[in-house]
Amino acid sequence: MIIKKVMNQKMKIAIMGAGLSGLACAIILERYGHSPIIFEKRSQPGDRFINAEIIASIFSRPIQDAYRFFSEDYQLFLQPISQISKLIVHSEKAESEVNEQLGFINIRGRHQHSFEQQLANQVKSKIFYHSEASYEDLLQEYTHVILATGDAQYAVKLHNYHVDRAVTLKGATVEGEFERSTIHIWFNNNIAPRGYAYLLPFSNTEANVVISYPQLGLKIKNDHELWNTFYQVVCTTMKQSLKVTDQFHIKDYLIGSCKYPRIGNTFFTGNCFGSLMPFLGFGQFTSLLTGIYAAYDLCGLGKYEVLTKPLMKKYRNSLVLREIFEKLDNPFQDMIVNQMQGFIGERLLRTSHFPSLRALSYILRPFVK
C-alpha cells in the first residue's frame, strides 16, 4: 500500500530559468499533462542585451533544417528573422564568398521577436519573475528540478562541470546598410586572438557585430584596443561608417560541459549541460534539445543520459575543431579561406554535403600537425 501510494504521487517539477531549454522543457511537459513551475530571476524571458544568433546545418547535422525539425518532430514553433544565403569569410589577407543556403538568423534577448519570447508565448505554466529562489530551496519543495539558468555557475558550484574555456565576448548593435541574408565571419589573430568575429544582420539597417576570444594563456592587447581594431576592419569591409547604438561586454564566460546530465532528480540543461558549441560559440540547437529531452525523461519517453549522448559527442567534436583553429596562425588561416572559394566553398558547404563536426576536424587536422 505504501509503495502504491508513493508511485501515485504527482511529480512537482520546478524549472530554474526561463531561457531556451527551460521553456522548451515546459512546453513538452505541458503537452503530456504536467504543470511545471518556472522560476526566473529577471523580469521577463530574455531579459538581457539584444543580439543575433544563427542555427546552421554545421551545428545540427544530420538535421539539415532545424526549424522544420523542431516543428514536425516536437511541435515547437520558432520563426527566424531571415535565412542565410551568403557567407563571406575573412582572414588577414584573404576573403571567400560562399553562396549557399546555410541556415537562419534569429534574435535573442529583450526583443518581441526573440526566441525566448516566441517560446514564452507557447507556455501556459506559471512563471515567477524576479525570483530569489535558490536551487537548494527548490530541491526541498519539488520532486524534480530542471537547472536551466543560462550559465554554468550552478553546475560549477555542484562540481558537475568541466570548464574548457573562459572567453571574452564584446559586441554591439550597429546601424548601416546590410544584406539581411549575408553574414560575415573573421578568423584573424590581430582582431580576435585564437578566436573569431562575426557580423549578423538584424535587418537591412541594423546588424550585430561581435568578437570572441579565449582568456587563458594569452598575452594580448586590452579588450578596448581589440574592439577598436575590429570595428575599423568592419567599417572598412562594409565600406561605410557604422553607428553604434548598443553594446555588451562579457568576461569569463564559461564554455564547458557537465560531467553527468542527471544527478538524482536534477537535470542539467542548456548551458548547465554544455550546450554552447566551442567552435563559433553558438548553442541554441543543443540547448532546445536538452530541454526537450529532460521533459521526455520525466514523461517516461526516454532516459536523459541516453538521449543526450549524441549531444555530448557533438560538443567534444566541436571542442576538437576549436582547438585546431586556435593553433592556426594568420598565414594558415589565409590559406584555408582561399581554399573555401573553390571545392570547399562550392561543394563542402552545401547543406546536403556538409560534414559533421567530427569529419570536419579530421579534414583540418593535417594542417596543424
Residue ranges of predicted features:
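Beta1/beta-strand and adjacent pyrophosphate-binding region of the FAD-binding site
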Residues: 8-21
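Predominantly flavin-linked oxidoreductase catalytic cores and closely associated redox partners
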Residues: 113-237
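N-terminal FAD cofactor-binding segment of flavoenzymes
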Residues: 41-91
